[in-house]
Amino acid sequence: MPHTLPLRCTLPLAILLLVLLSPVQAAELFYLGQKIPDIHKPWNSADYQQLLDALNKVDSTQLNALPRRSGEFTGPIYQRMVSEENFRPQLNIYAPLELRQNEAREALFRLKELMRLYFDFRAVQQPYAAEALGLMSYSLRQQAVLFTLTTEFWMTLSASEQSNPVRLQGLHETKAAAAMLTSSALDYLGLTKQFGREELVLYSAELSKQLPGLFIHLSTDVRAALLQRIEQLAQQHTYSEVQASMRELQPVLLSIQRDVQSKLAAAEAQPRQAPTRSLDLSVPTESAQ
C-alpha cells in the first residue's frame, strides 16, 4: 500500500479531533481526518463498517497509524472495538431474535475484515501484534454469541422447518465457519517468530476464557480434534506461560465434552415415539353396504 505522509508530522496534530455539535447531540469523532463512530456507546455492524472504511483510508496514506491497544490517544478507540458492551444489543431479549442474529452475523463479518487489516503476514514480525491477536480472541466471543442466537432461533422453528434443506445448510455453514475460526485462533499460538512472547502469553490467557463459550457449539469431531490440539500445546508450546494457560483450559473443555456426550447418550437412549395414527373418518365397510 502507498504511504505518502510521514506519521510523525501528522500524529501529534491530528490524532483525534472532536467537534461538539450541541450539548444534546453526540460528538463527531475524527481519526487522522476520517470520521469514526462514537466510542462512548456500543457499536453495531454499521459502526464497524464506518470504522473499517476510515481505517482503510488511513492505512493507505499513513505508516503504522492504526489504533493501538494501549495507546494514549488511540487506546480508547481500540478498546471500543473489542468492548463486551457491544454485545448487549445482540443479547437484548426484548428485540426480535432474527434481527439480533443477523446483526451478530454482520458484526462478525466486519470483525474478520478488521483482522485482515491488522494482520500482515508478509512482515517478519507483526506490526500490530497485540491488536491483531486481541481482535482474534474478541471474534471468538462474537462467534459464540452468534451461535447462541442461532441455537435460540433454531428452537423456535417447527420440526418441518428444522428439516428444511436450506435451514440445515445454513446451520452447517455456521458450524463450519466456527470450526475454521477456532482452528485459526490456535494456529496463531504457533507463530512465535511473528508475535512476541508477551503478546502470545496474553493471547493464550484470553483464549482460555473465550474458547469454552464456543466449544460447546462445535460438532463432535471438531471438539475431539480441538482437545487434542490443546493437549499438545499444553505439553509442547515454546513458552511455559502458554502451556499453563492451555493446562487451565483443558479441564474446562473436558467437562463440557463429558456433559455434551452424556446428554447425547441420554437422547439416544430415549425410546422413539411411534408416529401418531391419523384419525380414520371413512365409513366402515359393513355400514356402507
Model-assigned labels for residue ranges:
Residues M1-P12:
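Bacterial N-terminal signal peptides that target proteins for export
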Residues A27-A288:
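Non-catalytic all-alpha helical scaffold/repeat segments
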Residues T10-L21:
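Bacterial N-terminal signal peptides
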Residues S22-A26:
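Sec/Tat signal peptide C-region and signal peptidase I cleavage site
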Residues L5-P6, L21, I230:
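Generic extreme N-terminus detector
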